[in-house]
A protein has these predicted regions:
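Nucleic acid-binding interface residues in structured DNA/RNA-binding domains
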Residues: 2-104
């Protein structure tokens, strides 16, 4: 049986996601660190998988630490391209160029 997530935690994560500027990406771990849960990047992924039930958030701007896209989010690439984010030959976001500098 899976644990039910506290709505306040969900909104805390989603509010950080909402701060990611257009044309940039953040990693799951980066979001986790920003909310004080540095070792809970999977929690961030879990929340993002349910984000549509909480409102309209730019979840397409969150990738893994190597710039890989979410495997079950086919429109993620198109949305990032539309914002000017370029991809390396291996299909990953160039994290050196497009990683959001959040000050963390």
């Amino acid at each position: 049986m899976s644990k039910v997530l506290d709505d306040s935690l969900v909104y805390e994560i989603l509010s950080v996601v909402g701060e990611i500027p257009e044309g940039y990406v953040a990693s799951y771990g980066q979001i986790a660190r920003l909310i004080g849960r540095g070792r809970n990047s999977r929690l961030v992924g879990r929340v993002l998988s349910m984000a549509e039930y909480y409102g309209d958030y730019p979840c397409h701007r969150v990738v893994n630490h190597m710039g890989r896209l979410a495997p079950h989010f086919p429109e993620q690439r198109e949305r990032l391209l539309a914002e000017g984010v370029a991809f390396r030959e291996n299909g990953c976001v160039d994290m050196k160029k497009y990683l959001w500098d959040c000050g963390c």
